[in-house]
Amino acid sequence: MFSRLIHIVQSFSKVERLLFYGALVIFIVSGAILAIEATDEYTYKKPLPGGRYSEGFVGQLTAINPILTNNDIDRTISKLLFETLDALSESIKDDGKRVWTVRLKDNVLWHDGEMITSDDVVFTIQTIQNPNAFSPLFTTWQGVVAERVSEKEVRLTIRTPYVFFNDNLKDLPIIPKHIFDHIPPTNLRLSEYSIEAIGSGPYKFDSYQKRKDGFITKYTLALNDHYYGNAPLIHFVDFKFYSSLEDLVVGFNAGEISGFGTFDPRITKEISRSHVVYSLLLPQYYALFLNQNSSLPLKEKNVRLALDYAIDRKRIIDEVFLGHAITVSGPLVPGSSGYSPSVNVPKEYNPTKAHTILESSGWKPNSDHRGIRTRRLGDAIVLLEFTITTPDTPLLVKTAQIIRENLEAVGSKVTLDIVSIDSINKDIIPSRNYQITLFGNITGRQPDFFSFWHSSQRFYPGLNLALYQNKSADNLIESIRQNSDPEKRQSDLTTLQSAIIQDYPVLFLYAPHYIHITEPRIKGFDAKWVLTPAYKFDTIKSWYINTTRALR
């Protein structure tokens, strides 16, 4: 049959052969197109279990124990290894005031096969409350009494009503008592279980690699075969560690890792391989916190108002963050729970108005001081000068440089004090030894303003970095924490935001986006908003690499 067809074609004239072959090509191409369309119409790509994802980090893990984590690396890995009380609970009920009862799910196991019980919950809370454990959660859990009711039930009692306690309870990560019970709290970070962790999450510890100098280069997780819930599709997750962001990007370009995260969008210009960029919003903002106790000019509200008008936030967002940030007008990020658009009016860049306010307030350019504005206060001539203290990170240093330029343009003198992150956290912030500090606040899931804005938190370990004092604001903060009526609580939140904004204790700047970068083959990532960078892995159960086709 085939040889006869060839014989027939050979008998064609040259023109007939061209027409025949043209028709044949059209037939084959049309058939292929129809086949593809039919495949797309009657089948779909279905995620398939398997594959390996590798996340890159700059730095090192220190303790994979969720009640001890104080950095994004430890928090990220811990979230995949340990479950929260919300995930482990069948029910969480409260009496509407001060008592919560938690019922754990049946047959939920630790990675080593041991049963999770109420003893683990009580042990976790009591360990956090032990000052020798140095848990970052210590303050949050003071005054909470945890009692074992039965093997699967726990009762928790708080001293005073607190409407946000339910969220604290749900977010509480649980650690195994049978692993840590015999380890002194001071040694928890040194325990081998802070590396070779035993948790209850969808992934379990598999292995790690380190250099001779002790630097851990790779930490691997595998699917938890005891997991009680829907398992992720990706079977292995590697965390690879680099000494610098530059080395990490080289690793990504070389295919060593599948993805990484950063707050610095400028790094995308250094990527040479195909990639996908996700820009995620967080409840985190940066601002200039003003210490009025250390600067006479800052005590004047009109000076603070003028400085606010002088700052070009759009320029900061465009030049420093390449547009991957939004302006912030108050103590909550847009989209956060409790945010009130009506009082968070967008900040106006108006250096002319800043000049006018300073002039009308008596701050005049002084030729004896190179044109810097001065004002007589009592017997002294006071210069309009400030020192801005900022951590030594590229994004914040660049931000501070733009702000210095803005403020000097309206007649002030600005000195930048650039210090290490370690010095900021251990010395500068605890002592409040700054005039102005460029720093960030993570506001969290719920709008609890107490740590950041209540006057009792003006000094360490409180986080009221502006040393803000306002009795009305204190009363509102206390009311918000205790009032279970959502309408009244939102009304108080709106009033509180308005009060803080109008007092100008802080010059609010921007909320940066968190940039998540992956290979195109990593599918299923759909997060738009995350509480912290570690929370991007909350959606890992929907991530996939391998696919197959299935009938619709």
Describe the role of every protein-language-model region.
Residues 26, 214-217, 364-443, 514:
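Ligand/substrate-recognition segments at binding pockets and active sites
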Residues 218-222, 299-405, 495, 549:
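Append "and occasionally in soluble cytosolic enzymes with long acidic Gly/Pro-rich linkers
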Residues 224-270, 404, 413-415:
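Ligand-site clamp/hinge motif
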Residues 56-104, 126, 198:
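N-terminal lobe/hinge region of extracytoplasmic solute-binding protein
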